[in-house]
């Protein structure tokens, strides 16, 4: 992975911030309950790199002209025309809306396809959601991909100095007959108050009734424009602050150089902190079958060994053999009379004439054509022969025919250990966070309290203090095979192995994927069947797990009673880790320290420190001692915007390393030639085609496995190390808490404390990686008196505050607990499930804004069922649980 050189040449760009308001009155043909959104207003604010930092846009800019535009008729068409007119004299025009991918940009995509006033756009999509859309110099972005928060949260998060606040508007009142309405306040129902959260709904009615009682005159046309202008102003000012902070702190423009917050943070790292030759690029086939050697090639080579009764040097055993002529060959062996070379030609990579008969002069993804590949293959073969070697060659398609017709060969190859054992796939070691409910209900008894603690900035803590692999990995063969007192003490990297867990560990260590979930179990067979009884399996073969894990998790597992039975493959790496004493080392230390410093300074002085220089000096010294970061006294001041950006950069950085290499892609096709090119392409695997009209198709595809090349930005081993160390950090609390732990989620634990002598109590603090009290906002000494959980990310509890008041908290993944939903899903309703008073699910009915496959935005009625589902552990007693396989 290479650092990015900073391009000092200034690029002049235009930024257009916009928002559509829509009517939703026209029903979809054949479905009167589904209504189509049709834009009837667009407000756009245009700035350029010369003037974008100005808060006010009242005066025109000498470079980009007028700033604000209001389009009432054909708003989509007029916005596109504005963007096209803005292109001359500028490198690019970036059009940005909040939730553009799910809403605003959908209208633009349909317009561009139907009207054909520009070339067809190129898309990066996630399902029907548009991540980015490009049309020549026009680039459409979604600000929600940079800061994932509602528009109403932006003024506070970015410290906007104007008195901006996102107001309420009666969207359901936006109908054709009301466009010229002037009169009393519209009905409250048109504001959809039941979709607001309870507190927000209460504030809305206070505001609404105040205006209604004051006989406020509601001018729909003016109110619509004011509301939309306010939204665009909030978006523009937040994006400008966001951009300036990225430019100042990382020399990166997030909008012109990236499409998401993760890619922007990653670019800051590569521009400012990545050292050359530090992070390796992982070969597509891993390190065991080096140089992209295929499973088929190894299968043929082991068959040739068997047929010839010769031991052949090949990648299945070590590495491909390098001839003195500096040529890597697939297989090599010697006889008394001759030196033999064996070559397996993959049809795609070597340009097979039989398999690929068309488009042979089309440039493929790696920059050459099929004809060029064949010419290169023939030239190498001729060079091998002319050097005196006996050459045996086979094409992949010929091998495929052999394996189908030669039963002896098929049986031998399929049962050969070098073929049967799949190479280590680093993505198999990349697991997510640990989320489990150990109980479904717990009410405190006398002398007990339930506490809720959270690790402060868990992933930034791991990125700074955790260990990371560096340079290029290598396969370690010395420790593979059946277990013979194998020691992993010298191993750093990934290990593919078979492990036998203990049978009495309340919190298992190693994660496994089953039933589309991340489980922590003690018996494979019990996990597979979700056995609700004590483990009946006596044969270790029924209990073992085979998988790939980061070696640190395996070391902890061994310490907790796991046994390694067989090691299949090891990827060995060099390691770097930050040393607190020397304040050196670590892969991401410089990046994390930079934004940790910004965040800490932008948080301002602790309470009571503002006018106490001695206290300030102690604070700066303590932070330097703890984190190795020197705060600047003059820079310590509350700055919500700067703090928000720093926090985003700390939390949004590492995930880019885990990005998949072969993401689905969408191409808009309007010619028969282009369609045939995709259908006949050796690089593309068509996954779907959708006719838009008589002239246009959406074609979805992925790259074929042969065409996938190693990513130059992803490193799954780095991502796996991050999440593994995060799980181990959580385990440092789960292990001593034992059965007192009621619930955990990635970086947090809910547990029972009895304050008995010698009882373990997780320590809290304020620094990176310390535990913090999640209940402190209710007042010091607050605790949970009753906790219930219907499964991971499905819980509710009652907080008892120091003043004796009680507060209810409820969280259910996938459900917005607005006023309407909160009346159906709450502490009491969840408890009624847990204690057996209710069996039927809660059914929620609501209107939802969706996108059709044709990128039409609609509102349609939907239903969602909700009921507890605790399946990650087996039940134990009335409300407890044990891991699958516990005995």
Where are these predicted regions, by residue range?
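Conserved acidic
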Residues: 11, 15-17, 26, 32-314, ...
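Catalytic centers of nucleases
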Residues: 322-330, 745
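A solvent-exposed, charged loop/short amphipathic helix patch at secondary-structure junctions
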Residues: 350-372
């Amino acid at each position: 992975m290479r650092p990015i050189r900073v391009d000092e040449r200034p690029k002049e760009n235009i930024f257009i911030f916009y928002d559509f308001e829509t009517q939703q009155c026209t029903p979809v043909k054949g479905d009167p309950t589904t209504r189509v959104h049709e834009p009837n207003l667009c407000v756009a604010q245009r700035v350029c790199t010369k003037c974008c930092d100005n808060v006010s846009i009242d005066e025109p800019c000498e470079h980009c002209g007028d700033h604000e535009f209001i389009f009432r008729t054909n708003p989509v068409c007029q916005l596109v025309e504005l963007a096209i007119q803005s292109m001359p004299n500028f490198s690019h025009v970036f059009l940005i809306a909040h939730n553009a991918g799910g809403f605003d940009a959908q209208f633009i995509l349909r317009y561009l396809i139907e009207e054909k006033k520009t070339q067809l756009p190129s898309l990066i999509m996630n399902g029907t959601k548009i991540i980015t859309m490009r049309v020549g110099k026009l680039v459409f972005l979604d600000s929600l991909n940079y800061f994932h928060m509602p528009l109403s949260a932006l003024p506070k998060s970015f410290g906007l100095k104007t008195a901006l606040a996102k107001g309420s508007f009666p969207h359901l009142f936006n109908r054709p007959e009301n466009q010229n309405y002037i009169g009393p306040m519209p009905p409250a129902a048109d504001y959809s108050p039941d979709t607001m959260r309870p507190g927000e709904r209460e504030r809305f009615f206070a505001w609404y009734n105040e205006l209604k009682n004051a006989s406020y005159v509601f001018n729909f046309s003016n109110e619509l424009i004011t509301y939309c202008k306010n939204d665009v102003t909030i978006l523009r000012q937040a994006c400008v602050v966001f951009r300036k902070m990225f430019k100042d702190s990382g020399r990166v423009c997030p909008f012109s150089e990236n499409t998401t917050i993760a890619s922007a943070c990653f670019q800051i790292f590569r521009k400012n902190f990545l050292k050359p030759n530090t992070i390796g690029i992982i070969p597509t086939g891993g390190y065991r079958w080096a140089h992209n050697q295929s499973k088929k090639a190894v299968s043929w080579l082991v068959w040739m060994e068997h047929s010839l009764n010769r031991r052949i040097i090949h990648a299945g055993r070590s590495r491909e053999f390098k001839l003195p002529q500096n040529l890597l060959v697939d297989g090599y062996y010697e006889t008394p009379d001759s030196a033999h070379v064996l070559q397996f030609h993959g049809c795609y990579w070597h340009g097979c004439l039989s398999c690929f008969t068309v488009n042979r002069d089309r440039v493929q993804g790696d920059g050459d054509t099929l004809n060029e590949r064949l010419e290169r293959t023939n030239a190498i073969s001729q060079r091998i022969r002319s050097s005196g070697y006996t050459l045996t060659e086979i094409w992949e398609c010929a091998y495929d025919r052999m394996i189908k017709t030669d039963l002896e060969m098929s049986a031998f190859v399929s049962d050969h250990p070098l073929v049967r054992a799949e190479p280590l796939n680093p993505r198999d070691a990349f697991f997510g966070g640990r989320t489990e409910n150990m109980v479904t209900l717990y009410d405190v008894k006398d002398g007990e309290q339930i506490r809720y603690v959270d690790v402060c900035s868990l992933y930034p803590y791991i990125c700074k203090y955790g260990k990371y692999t560096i340079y290029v990995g290598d396969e370690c063969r010395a420790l593979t095979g059946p277990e013979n007192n194998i020691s992993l003490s010298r191993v750093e990297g990934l290990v593919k192995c078979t492990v036998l867990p203990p049978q009495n560990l309340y919190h298992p260590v190693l994660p496994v994927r089953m039933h589309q979930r991340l489980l922590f179990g003690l018996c494979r067979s019990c996990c597979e069947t979700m056995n609700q009884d004590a483990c009946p399996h006596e044969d270790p073969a029924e209990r073992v797990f085979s998988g790939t894990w980061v070696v640190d998790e395996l070391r902890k597992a061994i310490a907790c009673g796991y046994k390694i039975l067989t090691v299949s493959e090891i990827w060995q790496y060099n390691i770097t880790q930050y040393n607190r004493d020397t304040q050196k080392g670590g892969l991401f230390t410089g990046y994390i320290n930079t934004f940790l410093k910004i965040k800490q300074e932008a948080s301002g002085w602790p309470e009571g420190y503002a006018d106490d220089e001695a206290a300030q000096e102690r604070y700066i010294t303590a932070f330097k001692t703890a984190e190795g970061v020197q705060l600047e006294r003059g820079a310590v001041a509350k700055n919500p915007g700067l703090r928000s950006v720093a926090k985003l950069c700390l939390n949004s950085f590492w995930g880019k390393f885990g990005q998949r290499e072969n993401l689905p892609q969408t191409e808009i096709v309007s010619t028969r030639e282009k369609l045939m090119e995709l259908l006949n392409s050796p690089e593309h695997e068509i996954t779907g085609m959708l006719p838009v009209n008589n002239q246009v198709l959406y074609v979805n595809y992925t790259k074929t496995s042969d065409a996938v090349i190693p990513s130059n930005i992803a490193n799954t081993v780095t991502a796996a190390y991050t999440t593994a160390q995060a799980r181990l950090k959580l385990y440092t609390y789960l292990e001593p808490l034992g059965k007192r732990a009621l619930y955990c989620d990635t970086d947090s634990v809910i547990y029972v404390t009895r304050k008995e002598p010698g009882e373990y109590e997780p320590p809290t603090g304020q620094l990176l990686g310390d535990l913090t009290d999640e209940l402190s906002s209710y007042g010091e000494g607050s605790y949970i008196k009753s906790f219930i959980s219907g499964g991971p990310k499905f819980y509710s509890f009652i907080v008892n505050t120091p003043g004796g008041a009680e507060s209810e908290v409820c969280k259910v993944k996938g459900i917005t607990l607005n006023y309407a939903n909160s009346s159906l899903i709450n502490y009491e309703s969840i408890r009624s499930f847990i204690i057996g008073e209710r069996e039927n699910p809660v059914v929620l009915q609501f209107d939802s804004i969706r996108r059709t496959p044709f990128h039409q935005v609609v509102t349609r009625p939907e239903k969602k069922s909700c009921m507890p589902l605790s399946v990650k552990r087996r039940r134990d007693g009335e409300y407890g649980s044990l891991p699958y396989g516990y005995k």
